[in-house]
Amino acid sequence: MALSLEEVRRIAVLARLRLSEEEERTFAGQLSAILDHVRQLEELDVTAVEPMTHALAAGELPARREDAVFPSLTPEEATAAAPAREGTAFKVPRIIE
């Protein structure tokens, strides 16, 4: 089932998006494809699947490692490839007056 342009416009209003006519047509197709995929998922028989609260069971969680301290770059090394720097800091164009 394809989404109408009017439905896309309504979704855009709810999402506070301003879309061009071309974007409305593009999103209509993309959203329709997503909804078709969701409809296919709704048809799956999941009665034998046990509900889960996580993607992995509690015993399958990845092992945690201890934090380790590693040497880092000096400020000079970190800024060596910068197009502009001031001392040991990156120099960037002012964007706020």
From Swiss-Prot:
Keyword presence, Methyltransferase: no
Molecular function via GO: asparaginyl-tRNA synthase (glutamine-hydrolyzing) activity; ATP binding; glutaminyl-tRNA synthase (glutamine-hydrolyzing) activity
Keywords: ATP-binding, Ligase, Nucleotide-binding, Protein biosynthesis
EC category: ligase
Metal-binding as UniProt keyword: no
GO biological process, one term: glutaminyl-tRNAGln biosynthesis via transamidation
EC number(s) stated in the UniProt entry for this protein: 6.3.5.-
NCBIfam families: gatC
Protein name: Aspartyl/glutamyl-tRNA(Asn/Gln) amidotransferase subunit C
Organism field: Anaeromyxobacter sp. (strain K)
